[in-house]
Amino acid sequence: MRPLTFAFLTAVVLLFTSCHKHCNYHEGQQPSQTTIRIGALLSLTGSGSSTGQSSQVSIGFAQQDINAWLNSIGRNASVQLLIADTKTDTAEALKQLKIFYNQGIRLVIGPYSSAEVLAIKPFADTHGILVVSPSSVAVSLAIPGDNIFRFVSSDVIQGQAMSKLLVEDSIRVIVPIIRNDVWGNDLLGATSTNFTARGGVIYSPVKYDPKATAFGSELTQLDANVNTLLATYSPSQIAVYLCSFGEGTGILSSAGNYSHIKSVSWYGSSAFAQNGSLTADTAASGFAASHNLPCPIFGLDESARDKWGPLTDRITESIGRSPDVYALTAYDAVWVGLKTYLTTGTSADIATFKLAFTDEAANYFGASGNTTLDVNGDRAFGNYDFWALRQNPSGYLWQVTARYNSATGVLTRVINSTLVH
């Protein structure tokens, strides 16, 4: 292992000083055991693997940084992360959660997808497990009082952001192709509500099985739908709306073979933003770059740049690409969980632990910014960055092309790293 550099230590101190001054830890209330164990359900394989792999690295850094911090303040405790691969599969996620439960784990970071969260929710709710997903955004999972917390805002805001962009781009009708699960259907619902309210049209969504690996029939239907619309609208007024996980790369790789869908713009969604598989596929990345494909995702807080900047650099050095924002929300979730245990001890009942977690989240300002939760246990604040693929001399890279402020409803274009209203 390389020696810790002064710059690294400075970054860690900066990351937590602003939070620590607000925290009220009880000196006489040490955890009942020196090792605090936290579970992590990650999509290390399957269609969510791009996010899972970057999150695995980020929470590994969280464990390192936490233990260094605990040692620096003389605290007789350490954190240990137990990581399980859900394979981006609902049944596997539940299986692994039950294993964690039998191991005495009562705080779990993850899983990645809303479908997985939905699958494990009944068990978590009835067995006193707090689940903190860094990435689940389905609107229907915004439920007050349950044991599911989420470190991102629900897709209500994503629907607003996408609709704003579509209207400003003069798109009048969208033809969705979506993953047929709770996330895909909820996101389509949120976007449809906002887009139709702005005068837009949603035309004949094409839905596919989340386990599908070939998309010939879906692309044929999508192409036929666009062909029908071309009798009424110009190509510049029509867009394909892709709501996918990593399988979107396979869809884009084949899309160029269909004459009508390649004549219109494409728009993406949060689960595909910054996806690592897209840049590795020549056909898919070329199609994405030439057809726009802006993908909105929970945005970075500029006021937290001194925190997410160094962390992003560390993750990038480890995985060879820029991480998505969910790696940062996962990192922060581990920290808030640890600080909650320092406040409550490890034997607190679930109601006490949830209340303390909510308080700690409200007082924490980390790599992803302010982590205050709303009444549903979801992130209370959230702007969106739009990422799209752009070509440079070394290949294709994800770059921010626009930002949406949920408080003001303003969409700001980003051109050559300059904000343009």
Which residues are covered by each model-predicted region?
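Extracellular/periplasmic periplasmic-binding protein-like sensory domains
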Residues: 252-331, 344, 411-420
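Extracellular/periplasmic Venus flytrap/periplasmic-binding protein
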Residues: 138-140, 144-257, 301-306, 310
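Short, solvent-exposed amphipathic alpha-helices that sit
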Residues: 51-69, 92, 158, 182-202, ...
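Periplasmic-binding protein-like
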Residues: 40, 100-113, 132-134, 175-178, ...
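Bacterial signal peptide processing site
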Residues: 20-24
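Beta-alpha junction/loop-to-helix N-cap segments that form part of ligand/metal-binding clefts
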Residues: 25-26, 31, 37, 50-57, ...
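C-terminal motif of bacterial Sec signal peptides marking the signal peptidase cleavage site
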Residues: 15-18
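Segments of small-molecule ligand-sensing domains
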Residues: 314-328, 338-400
